[in-house]
Amino acid sequence: MADQRQRSLSTSGESLYHVLGLDKNATSDDIKKSYRKLALKYHPDKNPDNPEAADKFKEINNAHAILTDATKRNIYDKYGSLGLYVAEQFGEENVNTYFVLSSWWAKALFIFCGLLTCCYCCCCLCCCFNCCCGKCKPKAPEGEETEFYVSPEDLEAQLQSDEREAADTPIVIQPASATETTQLTADSHPSYHTDGFN
């Protein structure tokens, strides 16, 4: 069995119909009738001494499972067993995308764009490295502060000095408790009175 050639994936989408003895435009009722007839004929309980019948029964079950599922049947009719393999690997919703991206014109477009942008170096320089490592970076508008780099050591020193300054002044006021009726804007002043004390 190990020396047998692995079955290749078809793109025509007809072999499952041949397993059930049907043509490609068969209805779901035709598929059910043919499946029942062939399943009874090749069932392993009716053919205990015939291992070929068990293999044939597995093929019939597989064909029935695929052809009765509307989504899988549609994929099989369009792309064959290769489409079913792609659906299993990438999901049924991504089959069309896979075949579009693996078409000759999509590959040609990818190669053309690669040649046009010097193997995508222009895209890499402009997007990843901010136009030549920041040398061609657009200037910040007037009035806005420019960002600058702060080293981790300077940041640590700033945090420590803030902690020392905060340690010198004690906290003397408790924060106000918040409820569902607490105002979130600074315009309105909170009221600490209940309805009975108006």
Curated annotation (Swiss-Prot):
Purpose: Acts as a general chaperone in regulated exocytosis. Acts as a co-chaperone for the SNARE protein SNAP-25. Involved in the calcium-mediated control of a late stage of exocytosis. May have an important role in presynaptic function. May be involved in calcium-dependent neurotransmitter release at nerve endings.
Segments forming domain J: 13-82
Chain positions of motif Required for binding to Hsc70: 43-45
Listed name of the protein: DnaJ homolog subfamily C member 5
Residues recorded as bearing N6-acetyllysine in the entry: K56
Recorded consequence of changing H43Q: Decreased binding to HSC70. Loss of binding to HSC70
Modification(s) after translation: Ser-10 phosphorylation induces an order-to-disorder transition triggering the interaction with Lys-58. This conformational switch modulates DNAJC5's cellular functions by reducing binding to syntaxin and synaptogamin without altering HSC70 interactions.
SUPFAM superfamilies, A to Z: Chaperone J-domain
Membrane topology: Lipid-anchor
UniProt keyword annotations, A-Z: Acetylation, Cell membrane, Chaperone, Cytoplasm, Cytoplasmic vesicle, Lipoprotein, Membrane, Palmitate, Phosphoprotein
Subcellular location: Cytoplasm, Cytosol; Membrane; Cytoplasmic vesicle, Secretory vesicle, Chromaffin granule membrane; Melanosome
Biological processes, Gene Ontology terms: chaperone-mediated protein folding; negative regulation of neuron apoptotic process; neuron apoptotic process; regulation of synaptic vesicle cycle
Keyword hit for rRNA-binding: no
Quaternary assembly: Homodimer. Interacts with the chaperone complex consisting of HSC70 and SGTA. Interacts with ZDHHC13 (via ANK repeats). Interacts with ZDHHC17 (via ANK repeats). Interacts with HSC70. Interacts with SYT1, SYT5 and SYT7, and with SYT9, forming a complex with SNAP25.
Modified residues (Phosphotyrosine): Y17
